A protein has these predicted regions:
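Hydrophobic core
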Residues: 4-6
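Alpha-helical, hydrophobic structural elements that either
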Residues: 10-287
C-alpha cells in the first residue's frame, strides 16, 4: 500500500489547534486539496485520543508515543500518533519514521495499510517529532469494537538522511534505532462506515465509505482501470460535487482473489452528507 511522505516544511499552523488539525491542514497544503469546512467531520479531528497508553520496552532510546486517534470500521483501524525521539540528530538526519504492527499473540494481523507521515516543522510539532495517520487493514473482519484493547509493536525507528551524489542524484541513507516498543491502548471511536451500491459496475465486488476514505474491492481478473478509480467524486446532499479529495492510494490482494483499493480523504468527511459516490463516471448510491 502507498504511504505518502509529507515534507511539512514551512508550515505555520498553531499548536493549540491540536495535532490532528495541524496534520490535516498540512496534508491539504501538500496535496492542494480543498474540502469546504461544512463537509468536514470536525468532531473526528477535534476529539483527540484521551485514554492512557501503556508502553513496554527494554530499549534505552528516548522514544515516546502519543496517540491522537484510534477508530475502527469493520476490518480497518485508523491510528494517528505523534512519535517523539528526543535524541534525534537534526543536523545529521532529515526525518524519521516508525513502522507499527498490530499484533495478537505475537503475530502481525495487518495485511496492508495506507496513509501518510509528516515530520515536525518546529511550530505545531518540534523537529524531533513525526506524526502519522494510517488506516490499517486487518486480516480478519470486525476484530475490534469501541472499548477493545489494541496491541501494537514497533521494532525500530528508521532515520533518513538525504545524500546528493556528484551527478546530482539524491539518495536516502537509512539508519536504525533498535526497540522494540509494545503499545497497548483502547479503541476510542467509530469511523461510521456505509456501503455503496456498485452493482452497476462490472468487476467491483464491494465498496464502502467512511469518515476516513473509500475502500473498493475488485475481482482479481476484472478489467478495471485503476486510474478511473482514483478519479472519485463525492456528490453531497446539497448537490455539491467534491473532486480531488483522495490520496494515499494503495492496492494489494487479500488472498481471496480480491484486490483492495484504499483511497483516503485529505480530511475526514461527514459521511451523513454524502449522497452518491461517482466511480468511473457512474453514480453509486450511499446506503
Amino acid at each position: 500500500a502507498a504511504v505518502l511522505i509529507l515534507s511539512g516544511g514551512g508550515l505555520t499552523y498553531a499548536a493549540e489547534n491540536g495535532s490532528l488539525a495541524w496534520f490535516f491542514d498540512s496534508l491539504s497544503r501538500e496535496t492542494g486539496s480543498v474540502i469546504p469546512s461544512k463537509y468536514v467531520d470536525e468532531s473526528y479531528i477535534n476529539n483527540e485520543y484521551k485514554g492512557s497508553v501503556k508502553v513496554i520496552t527494554e530499549s534505552d532510546a528516548k522514544v515516546s508515543f502519543d496517540l491522537k486517534k484510534v477508530a475502527v470500521d469493520g476490518d480497518q483501524v485508523n491510528i494517528a500518533m505523534v512519535i517523539t525521539y528526543d535524541d534525534f540528530d537534526t543536523e545529521k538526519y532529515e526525518s524519521f519514521d516508525a513502522q507499527m504492527q498490530i499484533i495478537e499473540g505475537g503475530a502481525n494481523i495487518v495485511s496492508e495499510y495506507a496513509g501518510s507521515t509528516a515530520p515536525g516543522d518546529g511550530t505545531s510539532l518540534t523537529n524531533k517529532q513525526t506524526m502519522s495517520d494510517i488506516v490499517y487493514k486487518l486480516k480478519k473482519k470486525n476484530a475490534y469494537k469501541v472499548g477493545d484493547v489494541i496491541t501494537m509493536r514497533c521494532n525500530s525507528i528508521t532515520l533518513f538522511n538525504k545524500n546528493k551524489s556528484s551527478d546530482g542524484a539524491v539518495t536516502y541513507v537509512a539508519d536504525e534505532v533498535d526497540g522494540p516498543w509494545t503499545l497497548q491502548f483502547k479503541v476510542q471511536d467509530d469511523m461510521q462506515g456505509h456501503s455503496v451500491d456498485v452493482s452497476g459496475i462490472d468487476g467491483i465486488e464491494k465498496c464502502t465509505i467512511n469518515t476516513k476514505g473509500i475502500t473498493i474491492d475488485i475481482a482479481e481478473n476484472a478489467a478495471v482501470d485503476d486510474d478511473s478509480l482514483e478519479n472519485i467524486i463525492l456528490e453531497m446532499t446539497d448537490n455539491k460535487e467534491l473532486k480531488d479529495v483522495v490520496y494515499g492510494i494503495g492496492k494489494t490482494g487479500d488472498g481471496d482473489s480480491i484486490q483492495r483499493m484504499e483511497l483516503n480523504f485529505t480530511k475526514p468527511i461527514d459521511v451523513s452528507q454524502v449522497k452518491n459516490v461517482w466511480i468511473d463516471g457512474r453514480k453509486c448510491k450511499v446506503k
